[in-house]
């Protein structure tokens, strides 16, 4: 399952917008308020159509239930109108979201939700996606080994907290579909259900091999190794401590030392990423237990991540996208970020820039570039404080006007501020020395 296209009309800050997505990963960047999270919210709304209806028996539920709650009045774009000295903001209608999705069987499906006015909602072409869901349910209940796609959203409030149990235990009318419970919640991991599954698998594993349980633990280990590739780190093994109800990271070093850390002991950034990987992998195993040891490699789907760089050390920021893609090769990741470090490891064709309600591609290559050039050329951000930039420009002006004494004075100030080993300070010193010859 992959998202091909998203169309927005009068949704939040967007007048009209069409977005196409890469099969592997798409990274959205832009200033605060540019609409990065709004795009994820629009995708969340549309994907809930699939997730909500998959969890319910469509022979008993009303298929249009979610359509009545999809788009809210607060989602309408506001247009400012000047009336004398007063500025009036009026919601613009209709608010329309349309999504086009390709399924794993190459079937293409599109559907729309529309808020015609504050009191009127409508859905279009949802019959096709509902029929697909009903057929999926039928295949599962009759024993067909159909692959269910992972669909999940991890927002900025994502966390793994071993003491705060935010979600009650839940189940689906088809046990296999329990992998979708709260998957688009965005606020927290489904901790209770995940712990229950880990504990149950641990008990079964004492009697016989459980390939899908091994695959889930291996996925967490692989992702950790892909991000934290310290030379002296020999191996990483992931286990589950049933007594402490926590995932354990066991790290083995070349010098023979071993370090065992419960997941909740890790830093917020490490904990957030590894808990997210655990959540994705666990859901895959629930949705597709028949795939056994191949469940991580063979499960496709869509994962939304807001601010993927959140709390991460720059070294992890640089590797996180490639680590997730290698760990879950068939998953389409759609993420937002403020970090230029993330972008240094992402090809420009996978980056979308949001600005003033429009979307653009970077006009320069990004993969392998240094952080400063990404900041300056892609994110349109000064790499130095404005006062420092002005001082560097003043040095250039002094050299151009052959004011050597002034250039020396400015360079002395720059050395005091930046140090003598700063690249531009070194260059300025060379320039000054040449001017004195």
Where are these regions (language model features)?
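Extended hydrophobic secondary-structure segments that form protein cores and membrane-embedded regions
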Residues: 151-155, 238-239, 301-307
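P-loop NTPase switch/coupling surface
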Residues: 1-193, 208-211, 222-225, 396, ...
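Short coil/turn segments at secondary-structure boundaries
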Residues: 166-167, 234, 386-391
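A short mid-domain helix/strand-loop element embedded in enzyme catalytic domains
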Residues: 70-71, 77-82, 243-246, 295-302
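Solvent-exposed, amphipathic alpha-helical segments
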Residues: 46, 196-201, 283, 391-401
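RecA-like P-loop NTPase motor core
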Residues: 326, 341-437
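Extended helical coiled-coil dimerization/tether regions that scaffold
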Residues: 100-102, 175-298, 407
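Switch/communication elements of ASCE P-loop NTPase nucleotide-binding domains
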Residues: 1-58, 246-383
């Amino acid at each position: 399952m992959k998202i091909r296209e998203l169309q927005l009309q009068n949704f939040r800050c967007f007048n009209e917008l069409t977005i196409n997505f890469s099969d592997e990963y798409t990274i959205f960047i832009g200033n605060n308020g540019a609409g990065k999270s709004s795009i994820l919210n629009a995708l969340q709304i549309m994907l809930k159509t699939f997730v909500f209806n998959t969890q319910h028996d469509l022979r008993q539920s009303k298929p249009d239930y979610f359509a009545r709650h999809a788009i809210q009045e607060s989602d309408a774009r506001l247009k400012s109108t000047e009336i004398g000295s007063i500025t009036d903001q009026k919601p613009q209608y209709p608010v329309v979201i349309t999504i086009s999705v390709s399924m794993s069987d190459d079937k293409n499906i599109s559907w729309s939700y529309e808020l015609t006015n504050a009191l009127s909602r409508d859905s279009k072409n949802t019959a096709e996606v509902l029929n697909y869901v009903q057929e999926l349910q039928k295949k599962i209940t009759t024993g067909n080994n159909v692959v269910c796609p992972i669909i999940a959203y991890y927002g900025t409030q994502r966390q793994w907290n071993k003491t705060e149990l935010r979600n009650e235990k839940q189940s689906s009318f088809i046990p296999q579909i329990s992998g979708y419970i709260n998957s688009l919640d965005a606020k927290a991991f489904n901790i209770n259900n995940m712990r229950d599954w880990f504990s149950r698998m641990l008990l079964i594993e004492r009697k016989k091999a459980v390939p899908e349980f091994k695959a889930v633990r291996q996925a967490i280990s692989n992702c950790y190794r892909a991000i934290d590739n310290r030379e002296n780190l020999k191996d990483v093994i992931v286990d589950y401590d049933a007594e402490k109800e926590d995932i354990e990271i066991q790290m083995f070093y070349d010098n023979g030392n071993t370090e065992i850390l419960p997941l909740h002991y890790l830093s917020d950034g490490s904990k957030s990423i590894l808990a997210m990987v655990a959540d994705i992998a666990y859901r895959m195993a629930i949705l597709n237990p028949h795939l056994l040891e191949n469940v991580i490699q063979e499960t496709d789907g869509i994962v939304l991540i807001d601010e993927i760089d959140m709390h991460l050390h720059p070294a992890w920021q640089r590797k996180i996208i490639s680590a997730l893609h290698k760990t879950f090769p068939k998953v389409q990741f759609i993420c937002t970020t403020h970090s230029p470090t993330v972008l240094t490891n992402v090809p420009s064709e996978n980056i979308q820039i949001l600005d003033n309600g429009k979307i653009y591609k970077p006009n320069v290559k990004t993969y392998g570039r240094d952080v400063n050039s990404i900041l300056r050329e892609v994110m349109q951000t000064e790499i130095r404080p404005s006062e420092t930039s002005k001082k560097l420009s003043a040095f250039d002006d002094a050299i151009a006007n052959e004011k050597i004494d002034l250039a020396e004075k400015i360079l002395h100030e720059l050395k005091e501020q930046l140090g003598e080993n700063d690249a531009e300070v070194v260059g300025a010193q060379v320039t000054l020395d040449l001017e004195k010859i």
